[in-house]
Amino acid sequence: MAWGGVHTCCFHLCCCCSWPQGAVPEELHKHPGQTLLLQCQYSPKRGPYQPKSWCQQTSPSRCTLLVTSSKPWTAVQKSHYTIWDKPNAGFFNITMIQLTQNDSGFYWCGIYNASENIITVLRNISLVVSPAPTTSPMWTLPWLPTSTVLITSPEGTSGHPSINGSETRKSRAPACLGSGGPRFLVLVLCGLLLAKGLML
């Protein structure tokens, strides 16, 4: 069964589908656990209500019906598929929740003619469900509060605190000139005082 301008194929339960020739699937990308929200538009027509369907392609010429609307303005849910038709607005919504990688594949949404078992495809969807890309953990250094340090300097030295809790010290070399005592003892004492000043 065929007619001008459309391609006809049969799918599961002996139902046929038709869509414009050369139609390219729209590729949609999702991650596991996410929800697919899809809108299919059509031209509203007067007369008896025409059900709308969402099906998954199983071969180039076959498709399995997943969910079909029964009346307007009423949501129909089957498994993790939901369809809701709004004839006055000229579109119906498809929802797929809790996606898994097994949901990847080709889908069609369209107008379903139950008496002739024909669905007129409105959109051809290629759904790709893949794991979210992994990212390297971000390492941060712990925050170190600025500390204030009280420095007690021995006589002859002075301490000057600086930012970030570090300290800058200035020391004066002890006066090693003196007239009293042996020269050796004076040199030893001067060395000890100088070493102590550097350690502080």
UniProtKB/Swiss-Prot annotation:
This is Trem-like transcript 4 protein. GO terms for cellular component: cell surface; extracellular region; plasma membrane. Disulfide bonds join 40-109. Positively regulates Toll-like receptor TLR7 signaling in macrophages. Residues 1-25 form the signal peptide. One of its GO terms (molecular function) is signaling receptor activity. Keywords: Disulfide bond, Glycoprotein, Immunity, Immunoglobulin domain, Innate immunity, Secreted, Signal. Its main location: secreted. GO terms for biological process: innate immune response; positive regulation of toll-like receptor 7 signaling pathway. Glycans are attached at residue 93. It is found in: Secreted. It comes from Homo sapiens. CDD domains: IgV_pIgR_like. InterPro entries: Ig-like_dom, Ig-like_dom_sf, Ig-like_fold, Ig_sub, Ig_V-set, Immune_rcpt_domain. SMART domains: IG (SM00409). The gene is TREML4. Residues 26-126 form the Ig-like V-type domain.
